[in-house]
Structures are given as C-alpha cells and as structure tokens.
A protein has these predicted regions:
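DNA-contacting surface of Y-family translesion DNA polymerases
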Residues: 1-121
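Acidic, metal-coordinating catalytic segment for phosphate/diphosphate chemistry
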Residues: 86-190
Length: 190
C-alpha cells in the first residue's frame, strides 16, 4: 500500500493541500520549487512561464505558512553537461509573499540572461528557486503600500484553488510553459 500511496502523492491524485488553519507547522529553512523538463528548451517565454509557475507555488506556500521573504535564489540547469548549472539570486525591496512582486524582481534579474542563453541555443533543462531568508511577522510593509489589497486578492485565489483544484485560477504568464512529458504521470503512462 505504501507504493500506491507514494504514487498518488507524487502524481497529485491525493489532492493534498496546505491548509491555512494549521498554524503548527512552519518551515525552518524556507520553501523551494524545482522542475526538470523531459527535454531542454530554447524558448525564452516558455522558460519564463516555468519560472512564473515556480514563483506562484512558492508564494502560495509562503502565504499558507504565514511567512514572507525578500531574498530568493536558485539555479538554471542545461541540457548538455558542457554547461555547468548557473546559480542566481534576486531580492525584493522588502519581505513579501505577493507573487507579482517576486516575479517582477526575478524578471529584472533573469530575463536578459534567459534570452541570452536561448539565443545561443543553450537548452535549459531544469529550474530551481527557493527563499533564502524568512520573516514570520505580519508587520505592515512600507515598500509595498498596496500589499494588503494584493494579499486579499491572492488569499481569495488560494481559497478557490484549494476548493476546486490547483490551477482553477492562474495567471496568463504561467500558461505558456515548456512542452513535453515533464510530469511524472505523463512520463510513466505512455
């Protein structure tokens, strides 16, 4: 039964969700997201879409855990072993868990780099992104004055997605992504 349970968890069939009512758990080191594609991609917009998905997942988890971050890092892995993975780091002006702020800061740092890799036909095969510091307070933010409004909007989106399934409400930028059998279930049900 353990194998079936593990398969259902990996493939998302268990419909596991992070519940905001559970205040007992808080990650010690932050939250992260990683994705390896079945094939490398030189489509910069698809790579940016994959980053958007990762940032949406990280921000969703931060909101659920009641944490914020101002520093993020990760790496970009390539299809060929000729190119080593590239580490990156970006910061937001203040602690936040608002997807828009994190994505905008990420693109300021990585958009040209991704475009450059793709123009040089350096196929990107994997992405990883994580928080590097955390704030567990709910202190008002002086840099993002509209954070309360955004927080309410994202909490409503989170509730809809928790109720009706992940991806029921999503951003347009996360719809354009790397094509192929990138999900465990897709690779193993052929």
């Amino acid at each position: 039964h353990f194998g079936r349970m593990l398969f259902e968890t990996i493939t998302g069939q268990d419909q596991g969700r992070i519940l905001e009512e559970n205040h007992e758990y808080s990650p010690k080191w932050g939250v992260s997201y990683g994705h390896t594609f079945s094939e490398g991609s030189t489509d910069p917009e698809a790579i940016k879409g994959e980053l958007a998905i990762g940032i949406e997942m990280i921000c969703y988890r931060m909101r659920a855990y009641g944490i914020r971050s101002s520093s993020f890092g990760g790496h970009i892995g390539f299809d060929k072993n000729d190119y080593p993975s590239i580490g990156f780091r970006f910061v937001t002006p203040s602690f936040t868990h608002i997807t828009k702020y994190v994505y905008d800061a990420c693109m300021r740092e990585l958009a040209e780099l991704i475009d450059s890799f793709c123009q040089r036909k350096m196929a990107i095969r994997s992405l990883m992104i994580s928080t590097q510091d955390m704030d567990k307070t709910s202190q008002m933010n002086l840099f993002f004055r509209d954070e309360a409004e955004h927080t309410q909007r994202y909490q409503a989106i989170d509730r809809i997605n928790n109720r009706y399934g992940k991806g029921t409400v999503t951003t347009a930028r996360s719809l354009y992504r790397v094509q192929g059998n990138t999900h465990f279930l897709e690779r193993n049900s052929g």
